[in-house]
């Protein structure tokens, strides 16, 4: 996917709405929302890439729930997600 400065897949208005659901947040600038959106996209890309690598090892073309679960279990950087899975 080609990266363009200032563009994200996630709509900034929705990102800002999610951020503002935190009652401690009174204001969110467009730059902050953009940064959070880009970070979210990078996070999802990393998690999906790792899960896809596991699927490829099993000679599959698609990612399954179990692949994501295995990434969360095996990779310390995703440990904070372990409560979301039956690990």
UniProtKB/Swiss-Prot annotation:
GO terms for molecular function: nucleosome binding; protein heterodimerization activity. Pfam families: CBFD_NFYB_HMF. GO terms for biological process: CMG complex assembly; DNA replication-dependent chromatin assembly; DNA strand elongation involved in mitotic DNA replication; DNA-templated DNA replication; heterochromatin formation; mitotic DNA replication initiation. Keywords: DNA replication, Nucleus, Transcription, Transcription regulation. The keyword Ligase does not apply. One of its GO terms (cellular component) is nucleus. It is found in: Nucleus. Disruption phenotype: Displays partial loss of silencing in otr region as well as significant loss of silencing in mating-type and telomere. Decreases H3K9 methylation more than 50%, whereas histone acetylation at the pericentromeric region is significantly increased. Results in partial dissociation of swi6 from heterochromatin. CDD domains: HFD_Dpb3-like. PANTHER family: CHROMATIN ACCESSIBILITY COMPLEX PROTEIN 1, HISTONE-LIKE TRANSCRIPTION FACTOR CCAAT-RELATED. This is DNA polymerase epsilon subunit C. It comes from Schizosaccharomyces pombe (strain 972 / ATCC 24843). The lineage of its organism: Eukaryota, Fungi, Dikarya, Ascomycota, Taphrinomycotina.
């Amino acid at each position: 996917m080609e990266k363009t400065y200032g563009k994200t897949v996630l709509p900034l208005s929705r990102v800002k709405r999610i951020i503002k659901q935190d009652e401690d947040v009174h204001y969110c600038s467009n730059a902050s929302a953009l940064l959070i959106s880009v970070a979210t996209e990078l996070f999802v890309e990393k998690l999906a890439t790792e899960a896809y690598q596991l699927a490829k090892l099993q000679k599959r073309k698609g990612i399954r729930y179990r692949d994501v679960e295995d990434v969360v279990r095996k990779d310390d950087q995703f440990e904070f997600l372990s409560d979301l899975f039956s690990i």
